[in-house]
Every structure is written in C-alpha cells, then in structure tokens.
Amino acid sequence: MATAYQPMKPGKAGLEEPLEQIHKIRITLSSKNVKNLEKVCTDLVRGAKDKRLRVKGPVRMPTKVLKITTRKAPCGEGTNTWDRFELRVHKRVIDLFSSPDVVKQITSITIEPGVEVEVTIADS
C-alpha cells in the first residue's frame, strides 16, 4: 500500500529564498494648517493604494489647542485688558504594511510647507 505522504528533505541552512519582510510603518503627520495636512494625507494614501499596500487611516487625532493669555499694557497701570492667543496643532496617523523600500518611494512625494512627518518602522 503506497502512501501519498512523503517526508520533506531538509534543505541546507541559508539557501532558502529570502522573503521580503513586511513591516508595520506608522506615518505621523502634524501641522498648524489643516488644508496642507489633509492634502499630504490624501497624496500618501493614494500613492500607497496605487502600490496595492494595506493602509489604515488617516486616523484623526485630537487637536491640541495651546492658549496664552497676556496683559495688553506693557506697564502695570491702566485698565486690565487682556490678549488671548491660541495655536491649534492638528495630527493624523497613517499605518502602512509593506517593506521599507516601498515606503521610501511613497514618501518621496512633495510635502507641503508646515507639515511635519515622522516615520516609525516596527515588525508586524
């Protein structure tokens, strides 16, 4: 009675074909200008989908509002009048699953002025 199961022969160590390792790449974008930030986000996601990568995001993080209140008068006299200044920092997070070489091609797009980009690579 012949069996269809045949044991595999052990191959030599180090001669296996190297598989392209998939990494989880997190791209964090932050800016004071929402329009520029959204434009860079859409360009990144479009480029990743053209390369047929798995994309999560853009995830909109809470806007940080930094407020400073100061007196208008330089000296201590006069009516107490106050100036209120605020700075809004918007943040987006995009997760890609691919090799670092492909991400380098995707992130070579033109980034709008005022948009900060942070790329973190982790094993998935």
From Swiss-Prot:
**Superkingdom per UniProt:** Eukaryota
For this chain's UniProt record, which GO biological process terms are given? translation
Q: Name one GO cellular component term.
A: plastid
Family matches, as InterPro entries: Ribosomal_uS10, Ribosomal_uS10_CS, Ribosomal_uS10_dom, Ribosomal_uS10_dom_sf, Ribosomal_uS10_euk/arc
Named from the GO MF annotations, one term is: structural constituent of ribosome
> Which keywords does this Swiss-Prot/TrEMBL entry list?
Ribonucleoprotein, Ribosomal protein
Pfam families in the cross-refs:
Ribosomal_S10
Q: Member of which family? A: Belongs to the universal ribosomal protein uS10 family.
Mind telling me what this protein is named? Small ribosomal subunit protein uS10z/uS10x
Gene that encodes the chain: RPS20A
